[in-house]
């Protein structure tokens, strides 16, 4: 069990994740998430992390407009990501322990955490799927 304590965020994170800019639309974010089967997208401007948008953010925002006319709904989908993103999200550093990432995912009930370098530039994202994949790989290695 002690060898699991040595796992770092960089060992499991998704490097160079798909991202959005603050000026892109909710519709574009929803489409990108659906096409790639992901649930969160970091929002960046020139490589600097500004926030994160999740499928939950989008569903919640769209639920507020569920009863509007189709033309209005189309307008809602053109809302900029910056309007509903979570600004200044929790972040991790590549050399943080995976245990810290897991604790944050559980305590905050979130699906992913952006990983930034010392200059606050986005270098990856660690999700609960990344964590599960890591442990599945370790289990398979132990059984081999």
List where the protein language model places each region:
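Tandem CBS (Bateman) regulatory domains
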Residues: 1-16, 54-90, 97, 102-108, ...
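Short N-terminal signal/transit or membrane-insertion segments
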Residues: 14-20, 49
């Amino acid at each position: 069990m002690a060898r699991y304590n040595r796992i770092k965020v960089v060992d499991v994170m998704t490097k160079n994740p798909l991202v959005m800019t603050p000026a892109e639309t909710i519709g574009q974010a929803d489409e990108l998430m659906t096409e790639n089967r992901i649930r969160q997208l970091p929002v960046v401007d020139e490589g600097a992390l500004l926030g994160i948008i999740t499928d939950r953010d989008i569903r919640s925002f769209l639920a507020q407009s569920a009863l509007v006319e189709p033309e209005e709904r189309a307008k809602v989908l053109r809302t900029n990501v910056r309007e509903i993103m979570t600004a200044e999200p929790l972040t991790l550093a590549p050399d943080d322990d995976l245990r810290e990432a897991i604790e944050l995912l559980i305590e905050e009930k979130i699906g992913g955490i952006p990983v930034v370098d010392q200059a606050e530039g986005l270098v990856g994202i660690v999700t609960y799927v990344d964590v599960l994949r890591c442990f599945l790989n370790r289990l398979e290695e132990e059984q081999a």
